[in-house]
Amino acid sequence: MAYYRDLFTVLDHLSPIIHVNAVSKIEYLVRHIFDVQSISFLPGVSSKAFYYSITKFILTYHSPALIQALYESAETADHELFRNELINHLEEVIYAIGGIPRKQREYDALHQLHMLVSLVRIDSGISTKYDFVYYQNFDGLNRLLGELKISPSRVNLVIDRENETFLAAQKFAFKSVRQANSANSIHVRLADHLCGFVGRMMHALMEDKSIKEDPVSEIERLGENDLVRKRLLSSDWFKLKPEHFELYQIAYRVLVHKQQSYWATMTWSYFDQILVFYTLLRYIASYDRYEDFIKYHPELHAEYYNSACCQELDRAYELFN
């Protein structure tokens, strides 16, 4: 706690330009199975919405069988294996959530997704290699540099010691690329700790037991799960002491308020993980004083935060069209 307070206090003083990469590995695999060209020819269909919907569906309702089919399809190029398993999961979920009020919007969307998955062409020519993280790190950075009108040829890049990352960086037109041991480089060490904070926060939010749907062991038994109960982030997130509240305020300034560039964050179509994190920072920072924040019960904060997330999602969905 004290360390992160000091870290963000330093960053707040320095006001650095920060780029966060939050690309989903699940979406990467999905994009390597379904052909984007065939999606673009379907009238009224957004490829971004298509990839987002499949990725979110997998993360919400995945069984071991679906995940196994996804990775086997990527490794063997037998992409019909995944499509067939995905269609089976869609049909089971659609049947299970029918008539549940909180699932009505999702029910309608999954009906459309089921139809599209059946129609879209499978990309049979894709490479079976799916270790993507290295290239994406620098693709997002280059997009941010372009937005800021900074030529990569003027950038001396210093990265942590990791050979694959180093090789990927050399494929871009940076002025220079060198590796540094984080123990001997304050810049790399700051980046490491900042990435660790953001990554752990995103993971903790998405894995919160109060907000997650029940796990799916076998998709055919989904109806045994509690599909009716409204999911809200645990109220424990909002039981803040003054020092916690202050840390959120500083983190908001560093990661959100001072990072107004479009490419400050790199995602593809699926963005929920980073959205719920940024929304939490915005929500807590919307209270100017700790005394104002604690006027509301933690359970009420969970409701307000949920509403804020829904509003942010609706705004993001509008960009699909």
Cite the ranges covered by each PLM segment.
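An N-terminal structural lobe/cap that precedes and organizes the functional/catalytic core
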Residues: 1-23, 29-33
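Charge-dense, low-complexity intrinsically disordered regions
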Residues: 24-321
